[in-house]
Structure formats: C-alpha cells, structure tokens
C-alpha cells in the first residue's frame, strides 16, 4: 500500500485523517496513518495546548494541522462585525430553522440566541472570523510551526505566498483542498506540495463533482506540471472504497503515460 504520500511522511498506510479531536489525530498517526488537527476555531493558546498534548502522546509519529487561510481578504464584507453578518441572515431562513426545531422537539434556546448563549456564540464567531484574517492566521501558523508538525493544510483555496514561504522555511509540506481540475492547476502553479482532491461526497464543500470523477480529472490535468502527490477525499469510508480510489489513481497514471 506504499504511495508517494507514504514515502514523503514515512508512514505505513496512505491515509491522512482530518479531525478536530486531538485524541483521534494521535490514534491515526500511531496506527500507521497521519492525523491532521482542524484548528481554525482555536485561539493561539488553545492550539498551543492541543499541540503540546499531541507531542506528549504521539510517540514521535508525524502529524499535521489544518487551517482556513484566504489568499486575500478584500471587499465590502471585510469590515463587517459578527453581528452585522448575523443580521444579514434572511427571515425565511430563521423561520425555517424555528419550524424544524419545533417539529423535532429540539431545545433551541442556544440556536434562538438566548442572552448567555448568544454571547458565547458571538465570541466563537469573532474568533473564527479573526482566524480568517492574515494577522489571526499568522498567529496560529506561528504556533503550529513551533511544534514538530510535518504538514500544514489550507482548506480555503490557494494558500497565500507568505503561508507557502513559512512552510518552506520550516521544512513543512503544504497541502491545499480543491474541488475542480481548474483549482488544481492554480494550486500547482502556486507551489503547493500536496493536492487534497475533495469530491462532493466530502460534505459538498468544494463543488458538485463526484470523487471518482474528480480524482482522475485532476490527475490528468496536472500531469504536465510534474508528479504532485494527490490525496483523495469524499465518500471514502471502507477498505473497498480506499482500494478503489488507489486503483483509480494508478490507472490514471498509466493511461497518461501511454
């Protein structure tokens, strides 16, 4: 089951698992794969605490960190507060949410914005928004690079040049999420080390193209740009599905060479 990803990180299985749970990150890495901590909702202090815990429990195995780092942040929305953005939610959506909560007898006090819960929610939104700006993202990256991570992943388009530069300076591979072959070409041209090709089965975050269609499309599209490692994501939950995706990648490589 060896692949370029296995050789790159010296892992036994070509399986990279994203999780917000530090315990899962450690378990995956110690089982022969590679765990990646989703940290966009962390403060720098929270990230330091989690990464220190991982370092103490992972027995020197490789792991990574995943963030959302925009290539640029411009436009009329850049100066809006969390409350401004909340007020932009259409009333139709609010009514629909209330109906669903009532239909399934869900206690919606927090979702309806009770005073205490609303303050907590706004604080969380504020932290999330700050981490999407360069100053907030840089602070998280500085914490991440102060630990022995081997991968930093960006789940929001082409990483900005300063993020790619930080990766090179710290000898850390940079991965980026994508959902179309056009995205892949832009990522490769920017200098990304690993492409995370996510089909619509992966929550629909990147687009509407199925994983088994998207992966070979991307493989063919980047062939002329060199041998860039690909991680397939979306709808891969069993050993059979994992084997199918690996076969898809191998067949596409052979076909492109003919």
Which stretches of residues belong to each language-model region?
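A generic structured-segment signal
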Residues: 227-231, 241
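Active-site entrance/lid segments in N-terminal catalytic domains of soluble metabolic enzymes
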Residues: 1-226
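Residue-level detector of alpha-helix initiation sites
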Residues: 158, 236-237
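Conserved small/polar residues in nucleotide/adenosyl-binding loops
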Residues: 251-258
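Catalytic cores of alpha/beta
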Residues: 182-190, 237-250
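Glycine-rich beta-strand-to-loop/alpha-helix junction loops that act as flexible
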Residues: 230-236, 253
């Amino acid at each position: 089951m060896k692949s370029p990803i296995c050789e790159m990180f010296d892992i036994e299985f070509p399986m990279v698992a994203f999780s917000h749970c530090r315990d899962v990150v450690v378990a995956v890495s110690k089982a022969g794969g590679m765990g990646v901590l989703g940290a966009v909702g962390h403060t720098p202090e929270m990230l330091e605490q989690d990464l220190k815990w991982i370092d103490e429990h992972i027995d020197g195995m490789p792991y990574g960190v995943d963030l959302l780092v925009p290539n640029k942040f411009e436009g009329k929305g850049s100066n809006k507060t969390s409350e401004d953005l909340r007020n932009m939610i259409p009333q139709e959506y609010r009514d629909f949410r209330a109906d669903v909560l009532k239909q399934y007898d869900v206690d919606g006090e927090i979702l309806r914005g009770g005073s205490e819960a609303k303050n907590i929610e706004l604080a969380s939104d504020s932290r999330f928004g700050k981490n999407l700006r360069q100053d907030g993202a840089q602070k998280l990256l500085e914490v991440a690079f102060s630990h022995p991570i081997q991968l930093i992943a960006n789940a929001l388009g082409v990483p900005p040049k300063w993020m790619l530069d930080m990766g090179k300076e710290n000898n850390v591979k940079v991965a980026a999420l994508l959902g179309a072959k056009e995205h892949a070409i832009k990522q490769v041209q920017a200098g990304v080390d690993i492409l995370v090709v996510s089909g619509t089965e992966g929550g629909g975050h990147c687009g509407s193209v199925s994983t088994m269609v998207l992966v070979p499309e991307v493989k063919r599209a980047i062939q002329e740009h060199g041998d860039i490692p690909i991680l397939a994501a979306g709808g891969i939950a069993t050993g059979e599905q994992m084997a199918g995706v690996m076969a898809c990648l191998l067949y596409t490589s052979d076909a492109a060479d003919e």
